[in-house]
Amino acid sequence: MKLELRDVRHVYARGTPFEVEALGGVSLAVEPNEVLAIVGGTGSGKSTLVQHMNLLLVPTSGEVLVDGVDATTLERSELRRRVGLVFQFPESALFAPTVEEDVSFAPRQFALGEEEVRERVLESLRALGAGELAPRSPFALSGGEKRRVAIAGVLAMRPEVLVLDEPTAGLDPATREDLLALILDLRESGVSVVLVSHDLDEVAEVADRVCVLHEGRVSAVGTAAEVFYGDPTQAPATVRVASLLRGSRPEIGDPVRFGETLDALRALQGA
């Protein structure tokens, strides 16, 4: 599935003294089978942008296209099944007596049989390493466990594009690594992932492409290497280290991920 935003503009409180332009003509595509990271400072428009991807917010002007079709012509429920959105701190929306009931809520809205619903629930929980949590109360879980359950509720819809808004915020290192591994697994299974993050190191580890937003506009978009080496001072630690070495050792190339940078350093050590 290809998701496109064309010249999307969004104005909050339009026509009032409090009018604010949050997006100023953003054009961006989410390609099939990719991890696209969206980065930028607080207030740059990241959350506003991703809420247009399944029309939780409707553009003031511009278009959202799903496989070339105007998204406004599609049934909203079907669009939101295909483009799943997980807000920041989604665990605050947990409500059911058990984890299984909570995760099953969304699939049940599509008249699926009980066997199909249960299969999806267990499949999504297992993907997040949380299968054993199914019978437990979500309110008795740790913060990291609650986060996994909340994400599982969206995965149970089997989206073609999964949008994650700051999914690792507040998580312990082990849970964070598990979630980043899940993102890569989803891409391998054919799901595109849009990752909103302030953490450039995690972006470097998983993103195929990076979009930088500044004051509601795209200031850069490209592969992680293209974006980060374009401005190494605003880049993850791996790129900053490599950039310092490239002046005297250009053969180090353009490593972005931690493993790539480590391999380059080992190669230099052995040279």
Pin down the residues of each PLM region.
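Conserved beta-strand-loop-alpha-helix hinge in the C-terminal portion
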Residues: 217-241
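Conserved ABC ATPase signature
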Residues: 137-141, 145
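H-loop/switch region of ABC-family ATPase nucleotide-binding domains
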Residues: 197-198
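Catalytic Walker B motif of ABC-type/P-loop ATPase nucleotide-binding domains
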Residues: 162-165
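ABC ATPase nucleotide-binding domains
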Residues: 232-271
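Conserved ABC ATPase "signature" region
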Residues: 115-133
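Helix-to-loop junction immediately C-terminal to a conserved catalytic motif
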Residues: 54
